[in-house]
Amino acid sequence: LIQTGWGPYSSFLNNLAFARFASYDLSVIPLFILMGHFATQGGISKALFQFAASVMGRFKGGLAMAAVLASAAFGSICGSSVATAATITGVALPEMKRHGYSGRLSTGTLAAGGTLGILIPPSVPLVIYAILTEQNIAKLFAAAMVPGLIAMLGYMIAIAIYVRVVPG
């Protein structure tokens, strides 16, 4: 260190950081973001919510369940919880208000449903985790699918119980 100085160490750290993040696998992250943008601009998020509302509409609390279902579907398109929550909230919240849903149920449902974007593959954090820990991305996606679906069903069951127990 005294003879060579910090030059070799800083060069090593610089190359290590570049090599870690200049991987082909990381190129999927901007593509997920681009696909989510196309889905939003193309009206897919609204179509997903309308389809989910038509499927779940016959149940009490159906629009809240539809918001969770649409969040899971949109999360599987874009891979981001923040984008999922923002997009589905923009579509579902006005409809839920129009149908007389309470603010607590509406916002709680949309906040919880937005978290599905990180669980249901493709997920940006799962890709980053797989690259940093040198794990198989496909296996991580397969492992995350079941908990994501269980969370979605759990949210929908919680909504069904909530709307029966809490009046209004």
What kind of feature is each model-predicted range?
Residues 1-168:
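Alpha-helical transmembrane segments of multi-pass membrane transport proteins
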